Amino acid sequence: MRRQRKETNYWMSYADLMSAMLMVFALLLTIVILDYREDMVEKQKQIDAVTNVKNDIIAALTEEFKGSNLNIEVDAQTGAIRFPGNILYDTGSSEVSKEGKKFLSTFVPKYFSIILQDKFKDEISSIIVEGHTDKDGPYIYNLNLSQSRAFSVVEVIYSEGFKEFPYKELSKNYLTSNGRSFMVPINNEDGSYNAEKSRRVEFLFRLKEEERIEEIQKLVTEE
């Protein structure tokens, strides 16, 4: 009888221990889940803040250039300003034409007045003039052409003959140029390649927090 009582006490003690361990585990799991949720909420707030700024800039650019006769396109997703290369250059040339300079003298002041206004300028990391070509010719030739064309736009903007405009000096802290050869083509709605639209120049902007937010978005998606 005494042995049976001892065994009963033993199993009761073991059961109590297991119950206590399960309670501790459940408590720790709850804490981890709550911390995870708070972390996700904070990350989402950061993503939303950057997304809101980007959307505000895109909306302002769209409003500024809608209905204009400049023949430009505002990408609703990225905010990239896109216009055909033949507006600025003659075929095969990287030198900005007379008509191209006239176009830039109208476009550039309007663009910088949006991008570098007080409520946006502290959020901007860089502004990139980016050149693109079609697939005609070898990669290196087109890379050189696209880079030269993008650089020539920046060169014209800061040349002595270019008209003064607000934010001109400030823009030097942001503006750079880049060429992508034929690596980022434009396709038609049916997915077919559009050589004419692929020959283009784009004005892009990057936000200071954008790269970090992209990393956060990857983590959120993976988790």
Regions from the PLM with identified roles:
Residues 64-75, 119-125, 171:
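Short beta-strand elements
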Residues 47, 87-101, 138-144:
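Second-shell loop/turn segments in exported
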Residues 98, 130-210:
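Periplasmic OmpA-like peptidoglycan-binding domain that tethers envelope proteins to the cell wall
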Residues 218-223:
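Short, cationic low-complexity segments
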Residues 54, 58, 62, 101, ...:
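Extracytoplasmic/secreted envelope proteins and their assembly/folding machinery
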Residues 1-63, 67, 76:
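Short terminal targeting/anchoring segments
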Residues 81, 93-128, 158, 162, ...:
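Periplasmic peptidoglycan-binding/anchoring modules of Gram-negative envelope and division proteins
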Residues 71-73, 80-88, 126-130, 176-178, ...:
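Soluble periplasmic/extracytoplasmic beta-strand elements of cell-envelope proteins
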